[in-house]
Amino acid sequence: MKICSLLPSATEIVCSLGLEDQLVGISHVCDYPESVLKSDAVIITRRSSDLSGLSSQKIDEIIKFNREQKIATQIVDGDLLKKISPDVILTQELCYVCAVEYGAVCEITLDILDYQPKIVSLKPAGIQDILNNILLIADACDVIDEGNRVVDSIQTRIDFISNTLAQSNYKKGPKTFCIDWLNPLRNTGQWIPELIELAGGNEGLAEKNGKSREVSWSEVVDYDPDFIFSMPCAFPMYEVDSASRLAFSEVEQFNEINAVKKGQVYLFDGQVPSRHGPRFIDVLENFAAIMYPDLFNGLFNTGMYTKYSL
């Protein structure tokens, strides 16, 4: 079977199912596991605008302009798609910024291919949706038993955290503020507030399984979170650090926030929490280990985050 994955989350799911050798096409942002970059899979997408090295504000301006002008943020190379002729194409309907949209994929397959591949589109809002998507891809690729194994393994790790917290008789968890974008400031949505809740926290400014929204720093100051997790979408760690420092330096009352006073501001690799693949469980475990180190001493930092220092 020949599989083409047009988003990193789906690529990670495919590899977790043991199907990496069946990937014939990937997107330009598929980078995990690192072995996919050395595989025979062809990169068949590109950005319509070069966003490398730009500030959060500039990226936001370009994305909004492209949207207004109906310019696709991600583009599929039709010639390459025809060349690899996949049996299964994995796409998404969640975010027009992060990957090629489902509608565009359907359109190009009709125009370019002389057959109809199986198109699987993902649109998760919560954790159960992510688990269901693992099974959906497993079923489409005829490895449903392996899909069940992956889901069961993840569920076991979720249950460990839930049961440990329940047995500890912890009360109302700490207030958290998770940052999805720095300028304009946006909180997180979809599965992140749910992960915080499962880890024993309270993402009070966000809606579980809802959409990210713009917030003001005055809202954050009034909310006064106990923890701040900066994880701007798709930013690698070095960009998270520089962008967060710049944004924080411009907030007059930043040092008055409880999380800052207690040294409980953390910078996350933005390429991991934003993905709806199997590694969401690593994000959950890291949230739990940060907020409850005495309970989850065995859960360690996998290089996903670092503590922010002034």
Protein language model regions, located:
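N-terminal ligand-binding lobe of clamshell/alpha-beta domains
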Residues: 1-310
